[in-house]
Amino acid sequence: MRLFLMFNMLFNWFPQAEPLIVTVNQEQIEWQSVCGTSSTKTYMDYRMITNRDSQQYKYIQSRMEARNGLLYDTDGSIGVALGSWWGKIGSKWTVELSSGEVYDLVKIDEKADKHTINGCQHIGDGSVIEFVIDTQTVPNSWWGGNGLVWNGNFNNYHKFKGNIQRIGKKKTVEVELDVSEFFPNHIQYK
């Protein structure tokens, strides 16, 4: 027996408890200065994006789903048009309104720089956020007396009412976690 133990110790064949490390993706929010605080929130139908070669069109077709008039990404973010200040198509943001409502948004269309102030706020109507919607699935109660959804401004709907209070850029980072304590019988062989 003594020879067997010495042989195993020499060649390190005994099972050894090692940390069990897993890598997971974790979403983080980097809070930033607000480029515009407008309460105006306009909309456009996603069918207005017709260039099949554009990033916008491809993103919408591959990742967005229409539910009750809004377009949702696979993670639940609401599809919107934003200016160039907000980054590329697919950029994800968390927006908090002065009402306390918080929304996760994804940029699926871009407002032209010539129509915005510093790539942020629309020159004509002052909107920062423009919802990209599916007018064919909009609930009847959303149609205003003027024939527009929420009379042309999502701020007229209590859930989207308020000025932009703060914004956060969403990003995904890889994090390593030691999960050994959850698997006490885990043994790795060297």
Question: PLM ranges: what are they?
Answer:
Residues 1-16:
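Sec-dependent N-terminal signal peptides of Gram-positive bacterial secreted proteins and lipoproteins
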Residues 13-190:
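Solvent-exposed, well-ordered loop and adjacent helix/strand elements within mature globular domains
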